[in-house]
Structures are given as structure tokens and as C-alpha cells.
A protein has these predicted regions:
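N-terminal flexible/basic segments that precede or flank functional cores
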Residues: 1-28, 32-33, 38
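Helix-turn-helix DNA-binding elements, focusing on the entry/boundary residues of the two helices
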Residues: 26, 37, 48, 63-66
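Alpha-helical residues within the helix-turn-helix
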Residues: 31, 42, 71
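Short alpha-helical DNA-recognition segment
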Residues: 34-53
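Alpha-helical DNA-recognition elements
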Residues: 53, 57, 68
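Short, conserved catalytic or interaction motifs in soluble domains
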Residues: 56-59, 75
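DNA major-groove recognition helix of helix-turn-helix/homeodomain DNA-binding modules
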Residues: 64-79
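Short amphipathic recognition helices of helix-turn-helix/homeodomain-type DNA-binding modules
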Residues: 81-84
Length: 84
């Protein structure tokens, strides 16, 4: 039984709003720390194009990636996922 969802399909379709918030926050924190996409990618051991795709709302990131991003940007996962 799914709580708060009408169907299994609803569970699989992530909110684009959450991706937009994450994209905006990653970009804002990256710029706040004076980091290029490449520098952030290096700190996270990710590819530069992956960071770019997060900032363009093209990726659904894993919890592990969220953790690494938050640590590299000196913030927390909840901060990356909340509107500012």
C-alpha cells in the first residue's frame, strides 16, 4: 500500500521542482565558494559535465552524490534541497 500516492507511477516520477531547487542551490553555493564546475567536480570526484547536468536539472542524483556535494560545498543535504 502506498501512502499519500495514487499509483506506483506517481512514485517513479520525481518532482521537477525539487530538481530546480537543487540545481539553483548547487550553482549558488558553488559560486559563493568561487568554484568552477570543474573544481567542484574534482572535489566530488565527479565529471564536470555531471555537475553541469545537475545545474541544468537534467539529473536525478543519488543520496550518495547529494552527500558528497553538500560536503564539498560546506553545507548540508537539507540545505541543498530547500528553497531559499
Amino acid at each position: 500500500m502506498l501512502l499519500g500516492c495514487q499509483s506506483q507511477k506517481a512514485v517513479r516520477k520525481p518532482s521537477s521542482n525539487l530538481r530546480k531547487i537543487l540545481a539553483s542551490n548547487v550553482r549558488a553555493y558553488r559560486k559563493k565558494h568561487g568554484l568552477s564546475q570543474e573544481a567542484l567536480a574534482d572535489a566530488c570526484e565527479l565529471h564536470r559535465t555531471y555537475i553541469g547536468s545537475i545545474e541544468r536539472c537534467e539529473r536525478n542524483v543519488t543520496l550518495s552524490t547529494l552527500e558528497v556535494l553538500a560536503k564539498s560545498l560546506s553545507t548540508t543535504v537539507p540545505e541543498l534541497l530547500t528553497g531559499r
